[in-house]
Amino acid sequence: MEGKEEDVRLGANKFSERHAIGTAAQGTDDKDYKEPPPAPLFEPGELKSWSFYRPGIAEFVATFLFLYISILTVMGVSKSTSKCATVGIQGIAWSFGGMILALVYCTAGISGHINPAVTFGLFLARKLSLTRAVFYIIMQCLGAICGRGVVKGFQQGLYMGNGGRRNVVAPGYTKGDGLGAEIVGTFILVYTVFSATDAKRRARDSHVPILAPLPIGFAVFLVHLATMGITGTGINPARSLGAAVIYNQHHAWADHWIFWVGPFIGAALAAIYHQVIIRAIPFKSRS
């Protein structure tokens, strides 16, 4: 019967947590960190506070800069008659990943999401309120639309001639293929975000907060390398929305649902996996 009791309790409270070899956690107490309390669904009075709007403005600016630089890079590759004379696929992937790395580093102290899927995943994990999540997503979408609009203004002919570099399922792939690629790609990104910002890891390894943008940027880079040939790599609904709004012709909206449904499913799966499997937070005592 004792074994069955352990199965029910999952061992979450009976055994002390083990520390990885070589980390700063060796020789510390069983729990040397404090789990932040769950965010309320609605926070009274937050709409009247300037601290509510500052992160939203940061999300707008960061998403604007993200799309501005990355899509300009794509346009530069498309413009050249010789792909060998450009940064190529790897350069495009790194422009997306590198900008995320830089912008997360710059804005992590205030928000640092730059992606509705990331915001949605963190909301499901009770890291922010519903009102903040909705506000962040709106500002991210507006930033993406403006960023795309500026790029189109610089070189409208090239932009429209290349289909606005919108996200679509590539020929030879089904909508199911595209949806699957978006789910898995977003899962990788959001899972990396959870791991890089984990409260326990941040407390036990002092260098983790400084290095957190690095794995997040590399996750974006690697997912782009893997899925650019399938969907153009969405994994960010704001980015896909900005492309559809600014281009707005020739089936710009045909596969658009994939780039919202896929990332949101991937983000939800990543949130559940990290909170339930990796951290076992629902099974820990509330003492």
Swiss-Prot record:
Subunit structure, as described in the record: May interact with PIP1-2 to form heteromers.
Question: Which family is it part of?
Answer: Belongs to the MIP/aquaporin (TC 1.A.8) family. PIP (TC 1.A.8.11) subfamily.
Give the originating organism. Zea mays
Domains: entry comment: Aquaporins contain two tandem repeats each containing three membrane-spanning domains and a pore-forming loop with the signature motif Asn-Pro-Ala (NPA).
Q: Motif range for NPA 1?
A: 115-117
Q: What is the effect of changing residue 250 to D?
A: Active as heteromers with PIP2-5
For the keyword Transmembrane helix, the answer is: yes
This protein's source sits in the domain of life called Eukaryota
A Pfam cross-reference name: MIP
Q: Which gene encodes it?
A: PIP1-1
The yes or no answer to whether the keyword Cell membrane is present is yes
Q: Name one GO molecular function term.
A: water channel activity
Q: List the keywords (alphabetical).
A: Cell membrane, Membrane, Repeat, Transmembrane, Transmembrane helix, Transport
What membrane topology does this protein have?
Multi-pass membrane protein
Q: In which tissues is it expressed?
A: Highly expressed in roots, shoots and developing tassels, and at lower levels in leaves.
Any one annotated GO CC term: cytosol
Q: What induces it?
A: Expressed in roots with a circadian rhythm showing an increase at the end of the night period, a peak during the first part of the light period and then a decrease.
Any GO BP annotation: protein heterotetramerization
Where, by residue number, does the polypeptide cross the bilayer?
Answer: 57-77, 92-114, 134-154, 176-196, 210-230, 258-278
Q: What is the effect of changing residue 254 to N?
A: Active as heteromers with PIP2-5
Localization per Swiss-Prot or TrEMBL: Cell membrane
Q: What job does this protein perform?
A: Water channel required to facilitate the transport of water across cell membrane. Active as heteromers with PIP1-2, but not as homomers.
Quote the protein name from its UniProt record: Aquaporin PIP1-1
- Per the Swiss-Prot or TrEMBL annotation, the motif NPA 2 is positioned at 236-238
